[in-house]
């Protein structure tokens, strides 16, 4: 069976540029904190990647603090600050905020006090792109970076979260981007690495891959690689709607990530669809979240006003630059077959 990967919002395939950079970094033996030649060589790789990420993210002049991923970046940026946000934020951010900000039916968040608020640039589940006000305390750019022309310096925020593996870099590395002059106490203390914000020997191999992936992702964005992806996403949604008229498409009326389709057939459990499509050779995600073996209705969709029947029935199909129209149509055909079986059983 030739499997088709349609879960790019969960993680993107490793880019060749990132792999090459990581393989080359494996031969650099030094610790970046060491002053000898080997240490300086490792330090040079880290600083090169720091410059690559800063350039790709439009963050010239900002501090790029390398961490283990966007989850750690969220904790470092948000913990203990009394920040507010909305109930559509990723779990890694939601753990540190008071989810009091209103969300409308289109998934847009109302922000009264940007300086005390956290807001995502784009939602990983629905693809909805936020209208970011200036002066936010923290922007979660994890899903937007590499798919949209986001830039730290025009977002006007204090800090932003980014992750390597969402744009074709390795898993286990990300960055907290901090406006210069911002005070931020370290959570992990020790050797004072990463400008004193995050101690511990840097993941040189992963960081090298991150820098290369960021470079490649922004180059591809400028070359228009996401335009056909958006076209294929729209073709998919038309095929799904033709097969099942009752399908609800989440966020479709507004601006979305070009690769993301989130839709629900009320009453047809999202996790059931994920398993059925997996058996058919397609990797997708449920709109509902799994935690400790328990499945609950998507709080993102509930925050947008959908009831539990819809919120527990949603699935997410997220494409990538390598996705073909043939793969999209094969998925639509396989989904329609499983949908017809669902309707036959429900009759």
Each language-model region and where it sits:
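Pyridoxal 5′-phosphate
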Residues: 1-347
């Amino acid at each position: 069976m030739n499997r088709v990967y349609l879960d790019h919002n969960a993680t993107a395939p490793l880019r060749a540029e990132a792999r090459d950079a990581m393989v080359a970094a494996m031969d650099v033996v030094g610790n970046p904190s060491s002053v000898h030649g080997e240490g300086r060589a490792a330090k040079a790789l880290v600083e090169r990647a720091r410059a690559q990420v800063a350039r790709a993210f439009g963050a010239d002049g900002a501090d790029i603090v390398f961490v283990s991923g966007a989850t750690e970046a969220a904790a470092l940026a948000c913990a203990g600050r009394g920040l507010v946000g909305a109930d559509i934020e990723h779990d890694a951010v939601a753990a540190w905020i008071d989810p009091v900000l209103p969300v409308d039916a289109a998934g847009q968040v109302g922000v009264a006090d940007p300086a005390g608020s956290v807001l995502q640039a784009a939602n990983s589940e629905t693809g909805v792109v936020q209208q970011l006000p200036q002066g936010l305390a923290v922007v979660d750019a994890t899903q937007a970076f590499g798919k949209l022309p986001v830039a730290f310096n025009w977002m006007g925020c204090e800090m932003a979260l980014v992750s390597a593996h969402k744009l074709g870099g390795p898993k286990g590395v990300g960055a907290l981007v901090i406006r210069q002059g911002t005070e931020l106490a370290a959570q992990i203390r020790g050797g004072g690495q990463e400008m004193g914000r995050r101690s511990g020997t840097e993941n040189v191999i992963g960081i090298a891959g991150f820098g290369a992936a960021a470079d490649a992702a922004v180059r591809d964005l400028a070359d228009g690689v996401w335009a056909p992806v958006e076209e294929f996403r729209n073709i998919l949604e038309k095929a799904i709607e033709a097969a099942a008229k009752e399908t609800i498409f989440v966020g479709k009326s507004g601006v979305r990530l070009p690769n993301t389709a989130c839709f629900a057939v009320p009453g047809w459990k999202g996790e059931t669809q994920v398993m059925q499509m997996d058996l058919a050779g397609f990797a997708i995600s449920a709109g509902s979240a799994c935690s400790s073996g328990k499945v609950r209705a998507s709080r993102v969709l509930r925050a947008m006003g959908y009831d539990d029947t819809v919120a527990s029935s949603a699935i997410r199909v997220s494409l990538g630059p390598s996705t073909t129209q043939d793969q999209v149509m094969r998925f639509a055909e396989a989904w329609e077959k499983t949908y017809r079986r669902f309707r036959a059983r429900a009759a």
